[in-house]
Amino acid sequence: MLKKQFIVYGLVQGVGFRYFTWKTAMQIGVKGYVRNRDDGSVEVVAVGSTTQLAQLHTWLTQGPRTASVEQVIEQEYADSREFTDFSVRY
């Protein structure tokens, strides 16, 4: 399993982005979390197969119709923490 961190920029807070990301992640079957960041972006950490993470990345570039995604930065996530589900963090 691979671990990735995605930082999503644009109009992504206050538009249901975390909820829809959670719902999509559950459908895809990845584990990890989504949370708002202080700079107005959204952080997503996900653990899954190459295919699952590619599906999530594709969805993040579009987001829900209430959002306006400008950029998604993807990088390896080196933290050794294990995840048992996908959660919304506050």
From Swiss-Prot:
Q: Which reaction does it catalyse?
A: an acyl phosphate + H2O = a carboxylate + phosphate + H(+)
- SUPFAM superfamilies in the record: Acylphosphatase/BLUF domain-like
In terms of domain of life, where is this protein from?
Bacteria
* Stored Gene3D superfamilies: 3.30.70.100
Q: What is its EC number?
A: 3.6.1.7
Question: Which top-level enzyme class is recorded in the Swiss-Prot or TrEMBL entry?
Answer: hydrolase
Residues at the active site? R18, N36
Q: Does the keyword Cytoplasm apply?
A: no
Matching InterPro entries, A to Z?
Acylphosphatase, Acylphosphatase-like_dom, Acylphosphatase-like_dom_sf, Acylphosphatase_CS
GO function terms (MF aspect): acylphosphatase activity
Q: Which residues form the Acylphosphatase-like domain?
A: 3-90
Q: What is this protein called?
A: Acylphosphatase
